[in-house]
């Protein structure tokens, strides 16, 4: 029987991943600063979210509507009246420089 060369088992250091390795505990000051950073990020995010929601509701309620002065289909004389009104307005325009 021929013996095949075998590879040595990997070292203990190579088998352990960073997840399985023990981590050292953070100091109370580091934990407090981490919590403070998390709170600040959360407050900023909630503020931005509320501003976006307020803008959305404002734009939704104030969609805006416009009034057109187009005559109905049965009123051909209304077009002539509108043209005369706009011509009168042009004569009285004054430009201040």
UniProtKB/Swiss-Prot annotation:
Q: Which UniProt keywords apply?
A: Cell membrane, Cytoplasmic vesicle, Glycoprotein, Membrane, Sialic acid, Transmembrane, Transmembrane helix
Question: Which residues span the membrane?
Answer: 37-57
So which residues have sugars stuck on them? 2-3, 6-7, 17-18, 23
Those parts of the protein on the Cytoplasmic side are 58-97
Q: How is it modified after translation?
A: O-glycosylated. The O-glycan is modified with sialic acid residues.
* Family to which this protein belongs: Belongs to the SMAGP family.
**Sorted alphabetically, which PANTHER family does this protein's record hold?**
SMALL CELL ADHESION GLYCOPROTEIN
Q: What does this protein do?
A: May play a role in epithelial cell-cell contacts. May play a role in tumor invasiveness and metastasis formation.
Protein name, entry field: Small cell adhesion glycoprotein
């Amino acid at each position: 029987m021929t013996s095949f060369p075998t590879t040595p088992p990997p070292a203990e250091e190579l088998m352990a991943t960073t997840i399985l390795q023990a981590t050292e505990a953070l100091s109370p000051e580091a934990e407090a600063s981490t919590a403070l950073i998390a709170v600040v990020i959360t407050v900023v995010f909630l503020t931005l979210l509320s501003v976006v929601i307020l803008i959305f509701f404002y734009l939704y309620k104030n969609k805006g509507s416009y009034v057109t002065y187009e005559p109905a289909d049965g009123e051909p004389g209304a077009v002539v009246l509108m043209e005369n009104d706009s011509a009168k307005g042009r004569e009285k325009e004054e430009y201040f420089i």
